[in-house]
Amino acid sequence: MKFYGREKQRKDLHRLFLYEGMQIGLIYGRRRVGKSELIKQSLRETDVTSIYFECKQTTEQNNTESLSVLLADTFHFPKPSFDSMEALLTYLFEAAKEKPMILVLDEYPYLREVVQGMDSVLQALVDRYRDTSALKLILCGSYVDVMKSLLLRENPLYGRVDRTIDLKPMDYYESAMFYPTFSDEDKVRLYSVFGGIPYYNRLINSQLSVRENIIELIASPDARLENEVSMYLKSEISKINNANEVFEALARGFSKYSDLLSHSHVSSSPALADVLEKLIRMEVVKKEAPINDVNNKRKAGYIITDNLSLFYYRYVFRYSSQMNVMDSDVFYDRYIRDDFEKQYVPRQFEEICRQYLIRQNRAGKLPIPFDRIGKYYYDDPQTRTNGEFDIVTEDPNGYVFYEAKFRSEPLTQSMIQQEIEQVRRTGMNCYRYAFISRSGFDAQADEGVELIPLEKLYE
């Protein structure tokens, strides 16, 4: 199975593996984001002796036995006997005095549950062998809150972790590596549904159309990913009904706290705040404010950041009764097709364009690097309306306005001029304009205006 992307994280792990002395690494991120595959791929690319152990939700004795078997297989000697996990780990720290070694404890929170004082055990071993052992210990886990707690001052391991990798979903560009044969337009559509989770993207069948992949994987009864979102939520949140209500309201386009409270049917404001806080910690929802008014709570809003969750709650969860009694193609045509093309994908395209600009900014390819990117809140005195520009960057010279259009016709000169005039009416200190178009342009770029075709995003 081919491995895609994650170049920076692989380089970080290789530096850790090649360090002369002891190193402690922490890798965490949401389920399915590719932590284990990243580690396994990095281990395949190093000559350092390694043991990869997936901790189990059993007992200390069972985990100790299983790790002992791995130890024997790695070093080709009879299975040793250890009466505790501490004794086994002590043996490995000792062994790494003679020869560097990598030990990966994947799903570390499971081990932490069954071994009393596990963090303290590791702390004592790290302190004892810090100057003499060359063990590279990697702790990995999907329970983000638990893994982050290892870095807190009150935790025994505080100050002992040498490298931390908070693994995020891939962006649109790395995700497209999983489906290279699709057109650029279809890459946008696929990312809009399956996002940057490697597990989802590996399931995409290049022999099928985008529509067929969606039906096959998420929009039909018993589809491979039909229960993926709800199962993930249930594993993290006890009051799943409240989470479902909030997600459905967000998927319908409500983003302000007051709107969510009135449209989600969550019983109270504290209950809503609790659900939103948990969803934000799970990194499937985020709170964002306009870059020109970041401290104004009234203008802040919440959005779903996990694309599969957004698609699921907008179409599958909302119309599940219809989906279960209809032909899948008829269901898609009636409840998904038009809204998907006219509303859903164009909104997701804006996020793809933001990611493109961040990639360009990090690579030093923009004329002036920006400090912030986000929405811009405006008042239009001529029409006496207010609203938000979806993609604006801020740098020392002022603001740059971007307009993303995922439409089947080229952008014309008059459309571009209309957008520029609207920006100027707001009084925004905008010194440059750029337009990103799925279908190209029937226009010429004037001074201070950049025209970016879709194919440039995938170069």
Question: What does each model-identified segment do?
Answer:
Residues 1-334:
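Phosphate-binding site recognition
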